[in-house]
Each structure stands twice: as structure tokens, then as C-alpha cells.
Amino acid sequence: DRSVSRGLGDVYKRQIMKNPIFTGAAVAIITPMNEDGTVNYDEFAKFIDFQIENGTDAIVVCGTTGESSTLKVVEHNECIRWCVEYVNHRVPVIAGTGSNSTACAIEISREACKNGADALLLVTPYYNKTSQRGLIAHYTAIHDATDLPIILYNVPSRTGVNIKPETAAELAKLPRVNGIKEASGDLDQVAKIHELCGDELNIWSGNDDQIYDILERGGKGVISVLSNIAPKETHDIVAKYLDGDKPASKELMDKYEKLAKAMFVDVNPIPVKEAVSLIGFNAGPLRLPLVEMDEANKKLSLIHISEPTRH
């Protein structure tokens, strides 16, 4: 019966689409800049190689840490295109394509699809503070206009809107909504999302100091700022947990928790770009309106960088 075969095929395709894009640690990678403010692709290439050689499981390009909000659309698209080409299938490339304009998010997402990204990371619409119904309509429109797996990004401290567990469960019904980067800081909410969605929605921590806690609540890993300076260690926190060695995972988490928190003594990505420069890469300047940390915050954030993280 062809209709039965077709039905089984659809189920199989859905299962494939719901498989996690990655397990482990994806780096929310910085965007190295030249002194004139243009993207420094030579340094970017070196930094990507460093990440992959040290166990990073995926690259998230043009996210918050990559200063996406200060990139022009043409730069944003080119950065994703270049990154996909340079990584060349060594690890998945997840493109940050979110916007508070649904039409703009669709435009950038379609370009990322065309340029070969493996998945899309879509932050909730910021500033305009839409409702839960608005979130469902926003993500559904992007889903229907594109053909890549989608990772929802919930970071209410930056956007002013929270994806409630029930909303996440509704969005998980869409075939290509693959997961959620959960940075609400609310562990009860994470547990509720997992309870409602199960394997229909993969969960990744969006907070480096909560990697272990979110793994305990069904998480598959982390989309990480810390990985910029400690890729192997961040990967190992997740890998050891998923391999069944929870004590070793917890020990590593405890060891790197202070460093993870130090990356947020000022607004991300200000501290981490400073830290990347300290481990031997030319991260370059920030784009306005972001400015360098004052000396007190520099000392506070960088005092925790230990020898194992040095390049």
C-alpha cells in the first residue's frame, strides 16, 4: 500500500529532523574584527581551526557573541557564507538569523539556507515584546518559509519575552523545529519543557554555568560562550556526562564555573573578546555601541583564566 509507505516515510523524515543537530558543546563564536571594523577573516579562519582541533562540536556563527546586532545585513550574510565554506563540513554550522522583524528573519534565514548552513538559530523577537501567540506565529512563518532545522533561542534577559513551556511544546509540533537554546536561567522551566516535549524538542543550555544542571534535566549540551576560550573543557563537561561519568562532568563544571561567570562581568561579548585576545588570538575591537571593559572589570574577569585554557 503506497499510502502506508508514504506515511512511514513521513514518520522517518520527522524522526531525522528531530535528531539533535549536535550533542556536546557548540561555540557561540566571536567575530574577529580588523581595526577599521571590518571582519578579519584571516584571524577567523585560525580561530575556527583552533575550535575544531580542540573538540568543539558545532559552530554558531552570527549569534549574540558574534556581534550580529551590529553587522549590516550584507555583512551578516557574507559572514555565514564564508563560515560554511571554510568549515567545509568538519562540524555543523548553525547560523544566527533571528530578528524582531519576521520578514527580516525570513530574508536572512533564506540566505543562510542558500549558503549551506546546517541549521538556523532564531532568537525571540526583541524589543517589541510580542505575546505567546505572536511567538508561535513568528516562528511558524519562518519555519514555513525555509527548509532547515530550527533552534529556538530563549533569552528573556536580553529580549524582554520568554518562551513559555506550553509555547515551546506547541512549536515542537512543527516538523523542523529541532530544539531550543534555553537561557532563561529558570531550571524549573527547562524541566517542564522536557516533560512536555520529550524527544520532540532537543534542549541546549544557553548559560555556561548551568551546563550540568540542564544536562540533568534532559539537555543535549550547550551553545557556549566559554567554548571560545576553553573548547576542550566545555566539550568534556558534556561528553563525560553523556558517557555516564557524571562525577567527572560535575568536577569539570565546578572547576570552570567561575571562569564561565567571569565572561559576564560586562555585557557579552565584551569580556570574552578580551579573553580571546589573552589566549593568543587577535579578536580585534568591538563595534559601537559596545565598548571595552574598564580596567577593574578586566582584572575581575581575566583572573580566572588558568594555564589549561592558554593557546
Model segments located where?
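A general structural signal for well-ordered alpha-helical segments in protein cores
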Residues: 44, 76, 80, 105, ...
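Single conserved hydrophobic/aromatic residue that forms the stacking wall/gate
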Residues: 1-15, 303-311
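Glycine- and other small-residue-rich loops at beta-strand/loop junctions that grip anionic moieties
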Residues: 97-98, 124, 128, 153-160, ...
